[in-house]
Protein backbone atom coordinates (compact mmCIF):
# COMPACT_ATOMS: atom_id res chain seq x y z
CA UNK A 1 0.00 0.00 0.00
CA UNK A 2 1.36 3.50 -0.85
CA UNK A 3 2.47 5.62 2.11
CA UNK A 4 -0.21 8.18 1.36
CA UNK A 5 -2.79 5.45 1.90
CA UNK A 6 -1.32 4.43 5.24
CA UNK A 7 0.92 1.64 3.96
CA UNK A 8 4.63 0.92 4.16
CA UNK A 9 5.42 1.94 0.59
CA UNK A 10 6.67 -1.49 -0.44
CA UNK A 11 7.04 -2.40 -4.11
CA UNK A 12 5.14 -5.67 -3.72
CA UNK A 13 3.72 -8.07 -1.15
CA UNK A 14 3.91 -11.86 -0.80
CA UNK A 15 0.41 -13.26 -1.41
CA UNK A 16 0.02 -16.52 0.49
CA UNK A 17 -3.75 -16.50 -0.01
CA UNK A 18 -3.35 -17.12 -3.75
CA UNK A 19 -1.08 -20.06 -2.98
CA UNK A 20 -3.42 -21.45 -0.32
CA UNK A 21 -6.47 -21.17 -2.60
CA UNK A 22 -4.75 -22.93 -5.50
CA UNK A 23 -3.03 -25.57 -3.38
CA UNK A 24 -6.11 -26.54 -1.40
CA UNK A 25 -8.28 -26.70 -4.52
CA UNK A 26 -5.78 -28.75 -6.54
CA UNK A 27 -4.73 -31.17 -3.79
CA UNK A 28 -7.81 -31.38 -1.58
CA UNK A 29 -5.72 -30.67 1.52
CA UNK A 30 -7.60 -28.85 4.29
CA UNK A 31 -5.35 -29.21 7.32
CA UNK A 32 -3.73 -26.35 9.21
CA UNK A 33 -3.84 -23.00 7.47
CA UNK A 34 -5.60 -24.54 4.45
CA UNK A 35 -8.77 -25.05 6.49
CA UNK A 36 -10.58 -21.99 5.11
CA UNK A 37 -9.46 -22.55 1.51
CA UNK A 38 -10.23 -25.01 -1.28
CA UNK A 39 -13.56 -23.85 -2.72
CA UNK A 40 -14.16 -22.22 -6.09
CA UNK A 41 -15.70 -19.28 -4.24
CA UNK A 42 -12.37 -18.84 -2.47
CA UNK A 43 -10.44 -19.07 -5.75
CA UNK A 44 -12.68 -16.45 -7.34
CA UNK A 45 -12.13 -14.14 -4.36
CA UNK A 46 -8.34 -14.26 -4.55
CA UNK A 47 -8.21 -13.93 -8.34
CA UNK A 48 -10.29 -10.76 -8.23
CA UNK A 49 -9.27 -9.28 -4.88
CA UNK A 50 -5.80 -10.72 -4.11
CA UNK A 51 -6.73 -11.95 -0.62
CA UNK A 52 -9.40 -14.28 0.72
CA UNK A 53 -9.18 -13.06 4.30
CA UNK A 54 -10.26 -9.44 4.03
CA UNK A 55 -11.39 -8.77 7.58
CA UNK A 56 -13.08 -12.16 7.60
CA UNK A 57 -12.86 -14.93 10.18
CA UNK A 58 -9.74 -17.10 9.98
CA UNK A 59 -10.39 -20.44 11.65
CA UNK A 60 -6.66 -21.22 11.69
CA UNK A 61 -5.85 -18.00 13.56
CA UNK A 62 -9.02 -18.00 15.63
CA UNK A 63 -9.73 -14.36 14.81
CA UNK A 64 -10.59 -11.97 12.02
CA UNK A 65 -7.72 -11.36 9.65
CA UNK A 66 -6.74 -9.08 6.77
CA UNK A 67 -8.52 -6.24 5.06
CA UNK A 68 -10.06 -5.55 1.67
CA UNK A 69 -7.79 -4.50 -1.19
CA UNK A 70 -8.88 -1.37 -3.06
CA UNK A 71 -9.25 -2.94 -6.52
CA UNK A 72 -9.57 0.44 -8.23
CA UNK A 73 -6.36 1.75 -6.72
CA UNK A 74 -4.06 -1.21 -6.11
CA UNK A 75 -2.49 -2.82 -9.22
CA UNK A 76 -2.21 -6.59 -9.35
CA UNK A 77 1.52 -6.57 -10.02
CA UNK A 78 2.09 -5.50 -6.41
CA UNK A 79 1.11 -9.01 -5.27
CA UNK A 80 3.61 -11.84 -5.74
CA UNK A 81 1.70 -15.07 -6.40
CA UNK A 82 2.98 -18.64 -6.63
CA UNK A 83 2.01 -22.30 -6.67
CA UNK A 84 5.15 -23.38 -4.82
CA UNK A 85 8.06 -21.74 -3.01
CA UNK A 86 10.85 -22.70 -0.62
CA UNK A 87 8.64 -22.11 2.43
CA UNK A 88 5.56 -24.00 1.30
CA UNK A 89 7.52 -27.02 0.04
CA UNK A 90 10.33 -26.99 2.60
CA UNK A 91 7.83 -26.78 5.45
CA UNK A 92 6.10 -29.98 4.40
CA UNK A 93 7.09 -33.09 6.32
CA UNK A 94 9.13 -34.68 3.51
CA UNK A 95 9.50 -31.66 1.22
CA UNK A 96 7.27 -33.11 -1.48
CA UNK A 97 6.47 -30.91 -4.45
CA UNK A 98 3.07 -30.72 -6.16
CA UNK A 99 4.45 -33.04 -8.84
CA UNK A 100 4.60 -35.81 -6.23
CA UNK A 101 0.82 -35.88 -5.81
CA UNK A 102 -0.77 -34.21 -8.85
CA UNK A 103 -1.11 -35.48 -12.40
CA UNK A 104 0.49 -33.52 -15.26
CA UNK A 105 -3.01 -32.40 -16.23
CA UNK A 106 -3.68 -30.88 -12.81
CA UNK A 107 -0.24 -29.28 -12.73
CA UNK A 108 -1.13 -27.57 -16.01
CA UNK A 109 -4.40 -26.32 -14.52
CA UNK A 110 -2.47 -24.71 -11.69
CA UNK A 111 0.14 -23.23 -14.02
CA UNK A 112 -2.53 -21.76 -16.29
CA UNK A 113 -4.37 -20.11 -13.41
CA UNK A 114 -1.14 -18.68 -12.01
CA UNK A 115 0.26 -17.34 -15.26
CA UNK A 116 -3.00 -15.83 -16.50
CA UNK A 117 -3.82 -14.20 -13.14
CA UNK A 118 -3.30 -10.43 -12.66
CA UNK A 119 -0.44 -10.83 -10.18
CA UNK A 120 3.35 -11.00 -10.47
CA UNK A 121 3.97 -14.74 -10.87
CA UNK A 122 6.89 -16.42 -9.15
CA UNK A 123 8.13 -19.88 -10.14
CA UNK A 124 9.99 -22.15 -7.75
CA UNK A 125 13.14 -23.82 -9.07
CA UNK A 126 12.22 -26.81 -11.22
CA UNK A 127 8.49 -26.11 -11.06
CA UNK A 128 8.49 -25.29 -14.75
CA UNK A 129 9.36 -28.88 -15.65
CA UNK A 130 7.58 -30.61 -12.73
CA UNK A 131 10.85 -31.57 -11.04
CA UNK A 132 10.58 -34.90 -9.24
CA UNK A 133 13.19 -34.10 -6.60
CA UNK A 134 11.95 -32.90 -3.20
CA UNK A 135 12.91 -29.67 -1.48
CA UNK A 136 13.60 -30.73 2.08
CA UNK A 137 14.35 -28.38 4.94
CA UNK A 138 18.08 -28.50 5.63
CA UNK A 139 20.31 -26.68 8.11
CA UNK A 140 23.97 -26.47 9.14
CA UNK A 141 23.71 -25.10 12.66
CA UNK A 142 27.02 -25.42 14.54
CA UNK A 143 25.21 -25.48 17.90
CA UNK A 144 23.83 -28.99 18.70
CA UNK A 145 21.20 -27.52 21.02
CA UNK A 146 19.81 -25.26 18.29
CA UNK A 147 19.78 -28.08 15.75
CA UNK A 148 17.86 -30.32 18.17
CA UNK A 149 15.38 -27.55 19.00
CA UNK A 150 14.68 -26.87 15.32
CA UNK A 151 14.10 -30.55 14.60
CA UNK A 152 11.78 -30.96 17.60
CA UNK A 153 9.83 -27.83 16.69
CA UNK A 154 9.27 -29.02 13.15
CA UNK A 155 7.99 -32.39 14.34
CA UNK A 156 5.48 -30.66 16.62
CA UNK A 157 4.26 -28.52 13.73
CA UNK A 158 3.91 -31.52 11.42
CA UNK A 159 1.92 -33.40 14.06
CA UNK A 160 -0.45 -30.42 14.33
CA UNK A 161 -0.99 -30.65 10.56
CA UNK A 162 -1.85 -34.32 10.85
CA UNK A 163 1.33 -35.46 9.06
CA UNK A 164 3.31 -38.49 10.16
CA UNK A 165 6.70 -37.56 11.59
CA UNK A 166 8.21 -41.02 11.07
CA UNK A 167 9.79 -40.16 7.72
CA UNK A 168 10.83 -36.56 8.45
CA UNK A 169 14.46 -36.16 7.34
CA UNK A 170 17.06 -34.81 9.75
CA UNK A 171 17.69 -31.16 8.75
CA UNK A 172 21.34 -31.48 9.77
CA UNK A 173 22.05 -34.59 7.69
CA UNK A 174 24.09 -33.95 4.50
CA UNK A 175 21.77 -36.34 2.66
CA UNK A 176 18.84 -33.98 3.26
CA UNK A 177 20.66 -31.25 1.36
CA UNK A 178 21.80 -33.64 -1.38
CA UNK A 179 18.24 -34.96 -1.88
CA UNK A 180 17.05 -31.42 -2.55
CA UNK A 181 19.29 -30.79 -5.54
CA UNK A 182 17.61 -30.68 -8.93
CA UNK A 183 18.10 -33.48 -11.43
CA UNK A 184 18.80 -31.44 -14.55
CA UNK A 185 18.87 -34.51 -16.79
CA UNK A 186 15.15 -35.14 -16.34
CA UNK A 187 14.31 -31.93 -18.23
CA UNK A 188 14.95 -33.82 -21.46
CA UNK A 189 12.63 -36.70 -20.59
CA UNK A 190 8.84 -37.08 -20.63
CA UNK A 191 6.70 -35.78 -18.94
CA UNK A 192 9.10 -33.05 -17.80
CA UNK A 193 9.90 -31.94 -21.34
CA UNK A 194 6.22 -31.43 -22.14
CA UNK A 195 5.61 -29.53 -18.89
CA UNK A 196 8.44 -27.14 -19.70
CA UNK A 197 6.88 -26.51 -23.11
CA UNK A 198 3.56 -25.70 -21.40
CA UNK A 199 5.19 -23.14 -19.12
CA UNK A 200 7.05 -21.56 -22.00
CA UNK A 201 3.84 -21.19 -23.99
CA UNK A 202 1.97 -19.68 -21.03
CA UNK A 203 4.80 -17.19 -20.47
CA UNK A 204 4.79 -16.33 -24.17
CA UNK A 205 1.05 -15.64 -24.04
CA UNK A 206 1.44 -13.50 -20.94
CA UNK A 207 4.12 -11.42 -22.66
CA UNK A 208 2.30 -11.01 -25.98
CA UNK A 209 -1.40 -10.68 -25.04
CA UNK A 210 -1.83 -7.16 -23.58
CA UNK A 211 -4.82 -8.02 -21.40
CA UNK A 212 -2.81 -10.70 -19.59
CA UNK A 213 -0.30 -8.11 -18.41
CA UNK A 214 -2.97 -5.56 -17.48
CA UNK A 215 -2.45 -4.98 -13.72
CA UNK A 216 -5.92 -3.55 -13.06
CA UNK A 217 -7.80 -5.80 -10.65
CA UNK A 218 -11.00 -3.98 -11.57
CA UNK A 219 -10.76 -5.58 -15.04
CA UNK A 220 -10.68 -9.15 -13.72
CA UNK A 221 -13.92 -11.14 -13.73
CA UNK A 222 -14.37 -14.73 -12.56
CA UNK A 223 -17.33 -17.08 -12.93
CA UNK A 224 -17.64 -20.63 -11.71
CA UNK A 225 -20.02 -23.53 -11.36
CA UNK A 226 -19.67 -26.65 -9.26
CA UNK A 227 -16.83 -28.06 -11.35
CA UNK A 228 -15.56 -25.27 -13.58
CA UNK A 229 -14.09 -21.79 -13.38
CA UNK A 230 -13.64 -19.09 -16.03
CA UNK A 231 -11.62 -15.89 -15.78
CA UNK A 232 -11.88 -12.84 -18.01
CA UNK A 233 -8.96 -10.40 -18.21
CA UNK A 234 -9.93 -7.13 -19.84
CA UNK A 235 -11.05 -7.99 -23.35
CA UNK A 236 -9.75 -11.59 -23.27
Annotate each language-model stretch with its function.
Residues 49-66, 123-138, 152, 160-235:
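Glycan-recognition and catalytic regions of carbohydrate-active enzymes
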Residues 1-163:
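Conserved alpha/beta catalytic core and glycan-binding cleft of carbohydrate-active enzymes
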Amino acid sequence: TPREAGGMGLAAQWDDDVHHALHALLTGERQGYYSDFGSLDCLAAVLTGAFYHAGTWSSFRGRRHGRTVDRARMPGHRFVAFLQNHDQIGNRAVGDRLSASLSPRMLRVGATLLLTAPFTPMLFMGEEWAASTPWQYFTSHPEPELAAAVSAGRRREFAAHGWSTDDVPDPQAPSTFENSKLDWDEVKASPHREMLATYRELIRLRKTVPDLSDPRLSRVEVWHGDRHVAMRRGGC
